[in-house]
């Protein structure tokens, strides 16, 4: 093939994992007409995930830059907090539901909601909206990655569990907390190859709004709130246009996790009630709304062993594969959105600015730049998020259940998330890449 023809050959980009960040990354690349994008999803079809989560204003700005259609999809399904504050309530000491609903008696601290500006949604509903935006034949289901090889001048070779072998110029692994790509990239024996149990677990329930109102009161049930107490805390908010109330009950676990990489084990309402048996009556009533049989979800993260880098050669990790985080900042997925934006911006520069013979080295430079730009902020989040879990559960040294101290610590840490310059991040990535290319 002649050189001028080779220059027109599009990059082939494999995205491993079709979760929220995998889809966003794909849509960001497709929006920029970057190469031929293929998502390899291990499931046989899109899973119906009922869990809820939320995105900050910073994350939504990144979505808009990735592809405005992503933000439109979120807007269709998101629940906004109608109040200007998020309150953190004492779930432990109130002796009556009336006392528990009295802000003067039971609010530990409150935060201006405008700073984080969360939009909450059901994960599966938002995922379905984004999936509709994908062109046909972009997704291949039933493709569980088992290994890859990245060497020489050839493309990256991907090996799947079904025996199929594929090739790509670039691999972006969004394959989650227990990432196969991470283990290959770092080596199976590397301390950071596997996420570790954070000693926190969570139980989830979607309860009818009338029952939530009975337990918490009308005002509390219609906004995002948290209840704090010893060794546990509850985060709850309305979803699905306030028809359903989403409840997460988090607990501290002093035991090791004995189920390997299995993150979900059967549990029961009895375990929930035991965790809050000495709490206020409103919390016990809310806990009683959980189903009799439910699941206990272990929270794994990379706080004990952060990754030394997020990219090697022509393979990059993004989202939980790079920086698996506990959910206590409410910003783990938001960090993945930032990852996707930086990757899209840098790969656009590779495609538009590289001759064919330079593309391999420039791909590697772009992915290294991505890693360098994203690693400090995202790893700070992983560490701080685990510590925030202890803060909510009155385990943080010298603070305990002191609402004034809790608020000061919350604001100090959370400001790092919301006081962030997205354009500055993009400019930093572009400029660092351009400097790297010049040096070659």
Swiss-Prot record:
It is a single-pass membrane protein. It comes from the Eukaryota. Its EC number is 1.-.-.-. Asperfuranone provides anti-proliferative activity in human non-small cell lung cancer cells. Its main location: membrane. Pfam families: DAO, FAD_binding_3. This is FAD-dependent monooxygenase afoD. The lineage of its organism: Eukaryota, Fungi, Dikarya, Ascomycota, Pezizomycotina.
